[in-house]
Amino acid sequence: MSTTKLTRREQREHAQRFIDTLAGTAFPNSRRIYVHGSQADIRVPMREIELSPTLVGGDKDNPRYEANEPIPVYDTSGPYGDPDIGIDVRQGLAKLRQPWIDARNDCAPLSERSSAYTKARLADDGLDELRFSGLLTPKRAVAGKCVTQLHYARQGIVTPEMEFIAIRENMGRERIRSEVLRQQHAGEGFGARLPENITPEFVRDEVAAGRAIIPANINHPESEPMIIGRNFLVKVNANIGNSAVTSSIEEEVEKLVWSTRWGADTVMDLSTGRYIHETREWILRNSPVPIGTVPIYQALEKVNGIAENLTWEAFRDTLLEQAEQGVDYFTIHAGVLLRYVPMTAKRLTGIVSRGGSIMAKWCLSHHQENFLYQHFREICEICAAYDVSLSLGDGLRPGSIQDANDEAQFSELRTLGELTKIAWEYDVQVMIEGPGHVPMQMIRRNMTEELEHCHEAPFYTLGPLTTDIAPGYDHFTSGIGAAMIGWFGCAMLCYVTPKEHLGLPNKEDVKQGLITYKIAAHAADLAKGHPGAQIRDNAMSKARFEFRWEDQFNLALDPFTARAYHDETLPQESGKVAHFCSMCGPKFCSMKITQEVRDYAAKQNIEAGMADMSHHFRARGGEIYLKQEEA
């Protein structure tokens, strides 16, 4: 990792160059493929990793090879992962879902923006240089209609989004023919229902039951459909966002593209700086993944950062502003109730959630109940009109392992369960946010409590961090907890970067956090027994045993780091075909020795001889020691 510190100007110039030269880029020895659905415009992107053949015999002059089939993998990079697609962030991405949205004939363009704040920003000529030029005309459900994926699912309708997701979740494993690659250990799903083949009808059923959500605002047609639920692949969220003192619009767009390249299934824009509105527009128009926000952050900016001055009216205006821009899910801290705030007084670290602390301060200042709780039905009405999913925030999550699983945390969780049922009355999709800081032995209870009290709505957790002693390495401390809770049933994991508790992450931090959490999510998929999850592991192990170094690099989550580490000690091209690595050397490589043993056994027909001796042993009673007269 580079330790060179760039100035603010250099950072912005670097981001500008990145945007100016941005083009679709494939990973090493990979190509973009599309799996087609029942209609021409359902084209599901995947990345296919090409592998080299295996040497199976012959001699130096006439070697014999056996082909290794390519490995398809889930791909979140959208058009940025396709070298054949031209990229221009000033124009934004193609509107993939627009035909599907229009065909349902249940929404219409607005004649004007609903948000007073949006109108004021659009009228400000001084913002023209910052503004995204190709602004969409926002749509809203027509009177008497609901446009949510949950509503369609409950009506028995399988949408194109659901079919897209079913194809995507199967990860192209139907293309794999090798029995070696298809072998998989049985998992322990703790009640998860994992079918051998995910169908569009299964997707519809899970969404209808509230066990899964499809974050897909009708005003974000650029997004590629994805699903969050415990009966699907574990997903990973990346946080980006500027602040009052750091980062520019260019840098946030760069971080968005970078996040999708390294596997972010969703991205949360947590911007708190001056140009929140304009930054978000650039992000949405260029994002192939769902975008989430915490609207209270922007509402607070509108009252100059004074929590006591927040009002329902200002917050409502912010919801309308963001919904009409295309935000796919809102984190709403509606479970921080006035009566729960005193429960945090005896905590070691009190209230650590930014949104939770804002609402707690408002409640105490006015000695009134949380206005998000009081106006929750109105929030649901807004979400239903645009298909904004709700991520019910854990404002009272523990900020230290000492505070884990306490009265405040679980009281709020039960309230989130009550709010979930209210949201479902409006056909609004819901997921539940969770901790936080929790030692390993206390993690599973978080999952069981959530399933019981929140009616199996998808769980979305920050880690949890399993120890508090490792600032600078909290992507490790939390990755441990993330893998565990993902196995127990958590549907989406919010990444933690090395900068957690220390500062805002840069590009390299974002990558480190995402790789750590992709490992955690994949480990959880393996442990649950998600069909096909082990294919890539099997391909890697086969390549490793056969000393196919290039394939090992290319199958890795991070091919560049894998190659760089190998080349530190074996940089020559001959090192890429060597039947050993730098750790053991040529004479002590266990896999090389094993191959030699196999070759020797084959030549001497030892296996047949051993089988004959085994039969003879069993025929004599199977005893290791025999009396002399029996021998």
From Swiss-Prot:
Substrate binds at residues 239, 268, 297, 333, 353-355, 394-397, 433, 460. It is an enzyme of class 4 (lyase). [4Fe-4S] cluster binds at residues 581, 584, 589. Its cofactor is [4Fe-4S] cluster. Binds 1 [4Fe-4S] cluster per subunit. The cluster is coordinated with 3 cysteines and an exchangeable S-adenosyl-L-methionine. Its EC number is 4.1.99.17. GO terms for molecular function: 4 iron, 4 sulfur cluster binding; carbon-carbon lyase activity; zinc ion binding. Gene3D superfamilies: 6.10.250.620, Radical SAM ThiC family, central domain. The keyword Lyase applies. GO terms for biological process: thiamine biosynthetic process; thiamine diphosphate biosynthetic process. Belongs to the ThiC family. PANTHER family: PHOSPHOMETHYLPYRIMIDINE SYNTHASE, CHLOROPLASTIC, THIAMINE BIOSYNTHESIS PROTEIN THIC. Homodimer. Catalyzes the synthesis of the hydroxymethylpyrimidine phosphate (HMP-P) moiety of thiamine from aminoimidazole ribotide (AIR) in a radical S-adenosyl-L-methionine (SAM)-dependent reaction. This is Phosphomethylpyrimidine synthase. It comes from Klebsiella pneumoniae (strain 342). The lineage of its organism: Bacteria, Pseudomonadati, Pseudomonadota, Gammaproteobacteria, Enterobacterales.
